[in-house]
């Protein structure tokens, strides 16, 4: 690299009189720089011949590959819309030929039908399985309802009579409920309420304790009735 810089500053020019392809090698610190100058016409002619040979071999390989293609792709190659079927003239690697599926390269053909497996639509809800769909499961009921509509339209008087009968029935039921509600206070008597309340209170634990205390106080007062000063008995429980 330093030699190259020195040559640029000093102005040394290397000229070669031979017509062979020129190679300029520069060694510096174990680095080799090779500059290939493609100015030889003989070498370019040789390259063109090699390219032609490679093109013939690749065309032969392509014909063999196209002969192995399925019938669907062969019919596609015959179509006028060849925008999707222009393959580059490159050698095949390991006899693999990668093409898009037929549905993308059909080019408007209607003869090719893309087959779909029934397992593809398992996650798609079928209209018969829809929750929001309204199914007519009873055609007999619908026919009967249509017949009833025709009959009702022919007889409006029957509708009016049926409505009046329903209204009267509702009024009678409401009056019967009101009568039973009014009869309940008459059957309820205060003596029965007092008796039941006293029984419930007497069976209570606190009520029994109060009765015992009142009895004890009354007996003590009877014992000390001869004294002049009457003092109240001490309260055992703070109620």
UniProtKB/Swiss-Prot annotation:
Ubiquitously expressed with highest levels in the thymus. Keywords: Activator, Antioxidant, Apoptosis, Autophagy, Cytoplasm, Cytoplasmic vesicle, Nucleus, Transcription, Transcription regulation, Tumor suppressor. Induction: By adriamycin, methymethane sulfonate, ethanol, H(2)O(2), ultraviolet irradiation and heat shock. Rapidly induced in acinar cells of the pancreas with acute pancreatitis upon caerulein treatment. Transmembrane segments: none annotated. GO terms for biological process: apoptotic process; autophagic cell death; autophagy; cellular response to ethanol; cellular response to hydroperoxide; cellular response to methyl methanesulfonate; cellular response to UV; negative regulation of cell migration. GO terms for molecular function: antioxidant activity. It comes from the Eukaryota. Signal peptide: none annotated. A motif (LIR) lies at residues 25-37. InterPro entries: TP53INP. The LC3 interacting region (LIR) motif mediates interaction with GABARAP, GABARAPL1, GABARAPL2, MAP1LC3A, MAP1LC3B and MAP1LC3C. Interacts with p53/TP53 and HIPK2. Interacts with PRKCG, GABARAP, GABARAPL1, GABARAPL2, MAP1LC3A, MAP1LC3B and MAP1LC3C. This is Tumor protein p53-inducible nuclear protein 1. The gene is Trp53inp1.
């Amino acid at each position: 690299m330093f030699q190259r810089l020195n040559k640029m500053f000093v102005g040394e020019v290397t000229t070669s009189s031979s017509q062979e392809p020129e190679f300029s090698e520069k060694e510096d610190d174990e680095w080799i720089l090779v500059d290939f100058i493609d100015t030889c016409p003989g070498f370019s002619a040789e390259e063109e011949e090699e390219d032609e040979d490679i093109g013939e071999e690749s065309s032969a390989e392509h014909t063999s590959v196209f002969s192995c293609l399925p019938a669907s792709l062969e019919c596609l190659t015959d179509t006028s819309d060849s925008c999707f079927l222009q393959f580059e003239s490159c050698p095949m690697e390991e006899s693999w030929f990668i093409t898009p599926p037929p549905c993308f390269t059909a080019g408007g053909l209607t003869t090719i039908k893309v087959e779909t497996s029934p397992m593809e639509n398992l996650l798609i809800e079928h209209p018969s399985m829809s929750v929001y769909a309204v199914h007519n499961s009873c055609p007999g009921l619908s026919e009967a309802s249509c017949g009833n509509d025709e009959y009702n339209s022919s007889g409006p008087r029957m509708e009016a009579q049926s409505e009046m009968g329903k209204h009267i029935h509702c009024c009678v039921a409401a009056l019967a409920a009101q009568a039973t509600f009014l009869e309940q206070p008459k059957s309820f008597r205060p003596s029965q309420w007092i008796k039941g309340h006293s029984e419930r209170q007497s069976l209570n634990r606190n009520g029994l304790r109060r009765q015992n205390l009142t009895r004890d106080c009354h007996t003590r007062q009877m014992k000390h009735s001869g004294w002049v000063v009457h003092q109240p008995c001490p309260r055992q429980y703070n109620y």
